[in-house]
Amino acid sequence: LFVFYLINLIGVKEAAFVQKFMIVFLLLGLSTLIFFGIGEVNYENFESPEKLFPDGWYGFGLACVVLSFSTGGAQFISELGGEMKNPQRDLPRAMIFSTLLAAVFFTLVSVVAVGILPLEQTAGKSLAEVASAILPAPVYVAFIIGAGLFALATSINSTFTWATKSVLIACE
Protein backbone atom coordinates (compact mmCIF):
# COMPACT_ATOMS: atom_id res chain seq x y z
CA LEU A 1 0.00 0.00 0.00
CA PHE A 2 2.73 2.40 0.97
CA VAL A 3 4.55 1.95 -2.36
CA PHE A 4 1.43 2.82 -4.35
CA TYR A 5 0.75 5.74 -2.04
CA LEU A 6 4.26 7.09 -2.71
CA ILE A 7 3.97 6.58 -6.46
CA ASN A 8 0.71 8.51 -6.51
CA LEU A 9 2.23 11.28 -4.41
CA ILE A 10 4.91 11.69 -7.08
CA GLY A 11 2.25 12.21 -9.75
CA VAL A 12 -0.47 10.83 -11.96
CA LYS A 13 1.90 10.26 -14.89
CA GLU A 14 4.12 8.04 -12.77
CA ALA A 15 1.13 6.18 -11.35
CA ALA A 16 -0.25 5.69 -14.88
CA PHE A 17 3.10 4.32 -16.05
CA VAL A 18 3.16 1.79 -13.21
CA GLN A 19 -0.50 0.95 -13.87
CA LYS A 20 0.14 0.22 -17.56
CA PHE A 21 3.07 -2.02 -16.63
CA MET A 22 0.96 -3.98 -14.15
CA ILE A 23 -1.99 -4.28 -16.52
CA VAL A 24 0.27 -5.87 -19.12
CA PHE A 25 1.19 -8.58 -16.60
CA LEU A 26 -2.43 -8.98 -15.50
CA LEU A 27 -3.59 -9.46 -19.09
CA LEU A 28 -0.70 -11.82 -19.82
CA GLY A 29 -1.74 -13.93 -16.84
CA LEU A 30 -5.36 -14.06 -17.93
CA SER A 31 -4.34 -14.69 -21.55
CA THR A 32 -2.27 -17.65 -20.39
CA LEU A 33 -5.29 -19.21 -18.71
CA ILE A 34 -7.39 -18.58 -21.81
CA PHE A 35 -4.70 -19.97 -24.14
CA PHE A 36 -4.20 -23.19 -22.18
CA GLY A 37 -7.87 -23.64 -21.33
CA ILE A 38 -9.99 -22.68 -24.32
CA GLY A 39 -9.18 -25.91 -26.17
CA GLU A 40 -10.03 -27.99 -23.09
CA VAL A 41 -13.50 -26.52 -22.54
CA ASN A 42 -16.35 -29.01 -22.30
CA TYR A 43 -19.14 -27.10 -24.02
CA GLU A 44 -21.73 -29.52 -22.61
CA ASN A 45 -21.46 -27.42 -19.44
CA PHE A 46 -23.24 -24.63 -21.32
CA GLU A 47 -26.13 -26.67 -22.75
CA SER A 48 -28.71 -26.50 -19.98
CA PRO A 49 -29.81 -23.84 -17.50
CA GLU A 50 -29.38 -26.38 -14.69
CA LYS A 51 -25.67 -26.64 -15.45
CA LEU A 52 -25.19 -22.90 -15.91
CA PHE A 53 -27.41 -21.82 -13.02
CA PRO A 54 -27.44 -24.61 -10.42
CA ASP A 55 -28.76 -22.19 -7.79
CA GLY A 56 -31.21 -20.55 -10.18
CA TRP A 57 -31.05 -16.92 -11.15
CA TYR A 58 -29.58 -15.93 -7.78
CA GLY A 59 -26.09 -17.00 -8.90
CA PHE A 60 -26.50 -15.12 -12.15
CA GLY A 61 -27.51 -12.01 -10.21
CA LEU A 62 -24.40 -12.32 -8.04
CA ALA A 63 -22.25 -12.68 -11.16
CA CYS A 64 -23.79 -9.46 -12.53
CA VAL A 65 -22.93 -7.65 -9.32
CA VAL A 66 -19.33 -8.85 -9.52
CA LEU A 67 -19.13 -7.81 -13.17
CA SER A 68 -20.53 -4.35 -12.47
CA PHE A 69 -18.06 -3.91 -9.60
CA SER A 70 -15.19 -5.09 -11.78
CA THR A 71 -15.99 -2.79 -14.67
CA GLY A 72 -17.05 0.05 -12.38
CA GLY A 73 -13.57 1.53 -12.53
CA ALA A 74 -14.46 3.07 -15.87
CA GLN A 75 -16.66 5.61 -14.10
CA PHE A 76 -13.75 6.78 -11.97
CA ILE A 77 -11.71 7.65 -15.03
CA SER A 78 -13.67 10.91 -15.15
CA GLU A 79 -12.01 11.91 -11.86
CA LEU A 80 -8.77 12.19 -13.85
CA GLY A 81 -10.18 14.46 -16.56
CA GLY A 82 -8.26 17.43 -15.18
CA GLU A 83 -5.00 15.54 -15.66
CA MET A 84 -5.66 14.82 -19.35
CA LYS A 85 -4.54 16.94 -22.29
CA ASN A 86 -7.77 16.34 -24.24
CA PRO A 87 -10.41 14.97 -21.84
CA GLN A 88 -13.32 15.43 -24.28
CA ARG A 89 -11.67 12.98 -26.64
CA ASP A 90 -9.78 10.78 -24.20
CA LEU A 91 -12.39 10.16 -21.46
CA PRO A 92 -15.00 8.47 -23.69
CA ARG A 93 -12.30 6.46 -25.45
CA ALA A 94 -10.79 5.29 -22.18
CA MET A 95 -14.17 4.36 -20.72
CA ILE A 96 -15.35 2.48 -23.80
CA PHE A 97 -12.06 0.72 -24.50
CA SER A 98 -11.45 -0.36 -20.91
CA THR A 99 -15.02 -1.63 -20.49
CA LEU A 100 -14.90 -3.58 -23.77
CA LEU A 101 -11.49 -5.05 -22.95
CA ALA A 102 -12.70 -6.10 -19.50
CA ALA A 103 -15.85 -7.65 -21.01
CA VAL A 104 -13.83 -9.70 -23.52
CA PHE A 105 -11.45 -10.98 -20.85
CA PHE A 106 -14.26 -11.68 -18.36
CA THR A 107 -16.18 -13.62 -21.00
CA LEU A 108 -13.23 -15.73 -22.10
CA VAL A 109 -12.01 -16.41 -18.56
CA SER A 110 -15.57 -17.31 -17.53
CA VAL A 111 -15.91 -19.77 -20.41
CA VAL A 112 -12.68 -21.45 -19.34
CA ALA A 113 -13.60 -21.37 -15.65
CA VAL A 114 -17.02 -22.94 -16.21
CA GLY A 115 -16.06 -25.28 -19.01
CA ILE A 116 -12.98 -27.11 -17.75
CA LEU A 117 -13.92 -28.89 -14.52
CA PRO A 118 -17.28 -30.21 -13.36
CA LEU A 119 -19.34 -27.71 -11.42
CA GLU A 120 -19.02 -29.74 -8.23
CA GLN A 121 -15.26 -29.15 -8.25
CA THR A 122 -15.36 -25.42 -8.92
CA ALA A 123 -18.52 -24.08 -7.28
CA GLY A 124 -17.60 -21.50 -4.69
CA LYS A 125 -13.88 -21.85 -5.36
CA SER A 126 -11.35 -19.47 -6.83
CA LEU A 127 -10.05 -19.45 -10.38
CA ALA A 128 -6.87 -21.04 -9.02
CA GLU A 129 -8.69 -24.41 -8.93
CA VAL A 130 -9.21 -24.39 -12.69
CA ALA A 131 -5.76 -22.93 -13.33
CA SER A 132 -4.05 -25.68 -11.33
CA ALA A 133 -5.91 -28.31 -13.36
CA ILE A 134 -4.82 -27.03 -16.77
CA LEU A 135 -1.58 -25.10 -16.36
CA PRO A 136 1.88 -26.63 -16.00
CA ALA A 137 3.34 -25.91 -12.54
CA PRO A 138 5.70 -23.04 -13.54
CA VAL A 139 2.99 -21.45 -15.67
CA TYR A 140 0.54 -21.83 -12.77
CA VAL A 141 2.89 -19.89 -10.49
CA ALA A 142 3.25 -17.19 -13.15
CA PHE A 143 -0.55 -17.10 -13.51
CA ILE A 144 -1.07 -16.64 -9.77
CA ILE A 145 1.46 -13.79 -9.75
CA GLY A 146 0.40 -12.24 -13.05
CA ALA A 147 -3.35 -12.50 -12.64
CA GLY A 148 -3.85 -12.67 -8.89
CA LEU A 149 -1.23 -10.30 -7.57
CA PHE A 150 -1.54 -7.74 -10.35
CA ALA A 151 -5.35 -7.75 -10.22
CA LEU A 152 -5.09 -6.63 -6.63
CA ALA A 153 -2.18 -4.26 -7.27
CA THR A 154 -3.89 -2.49 -10.19
CA SER A 155 -7.02 -2.00 -8.08
CA ILE A 156 -5.03 -0.50 -5.22
CA ASN A 157 -2.98 1.78 -7.46
CA SER A 158 -5.98 3.05 -9.41
CA THR A 159 -7.90 3.71 -6.21
CA PHE A 160 -5.08 5.86 -4.88
CA THR A 161 -5.00 7.67 -8.24
CA TRP A 162 -8.65 8.68 -8.48
CA ALA A 163 -9.83 8.73 -4.87
CA THR A 164 -7.95 11.86 -3.89
CA LYS A 165 -8.85 13.98 -6.92
CA SER A 166 -12.19 15.31 -5.66
CA VAL A 167 -10.60 16.16 -2.29
CA LEU A 168 -7.75 18.02 -4.01
CA ILE A 169 -10.23 19.96 -6.14
CA ALA A 170 -12.22 20.92 -3.04
CA CYS A 171 -9.01 22.11 -1.35
CA GLU A 172 -8.14 24.36 -4.28
Language-model features: where?
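Membrane-interface loop-to-helix entry segments
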Residues: L1-E40, P54-D55, M95-L100, T164
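Hydrophobic alpha-helical transmembrane segments of multi-pass membrane proteins
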Residues: F2-L6, G61-S68, F143-N157
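Structural signature of transmembrane alpha-helix termini at the membrane-water interface
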Residues: L6-K13, S31-N42, G81, L108-G115, ...
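Membrane-interface helix termini and inter-helical loops of multi-pass transporters
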Residues: V41-F53, L119-E129
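Helix-boundary and loop/linker segments of multi-pass membrane transporters
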Residues: P49-W57, M84, V130-A137
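Juxtamembrane interface elements at the cytosolic ends of transmembrane helices
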Residues: S68-D90
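Helix-loop-helix connectors at the membrane interface of multi-pass transporters/channels
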Residues: E83-P87, R93-L101, S158-E172
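TM-loop-TM module centered on a large, flexible mid-protein loop between adjacent transmembrane helices
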Residues: I96-N157, E172
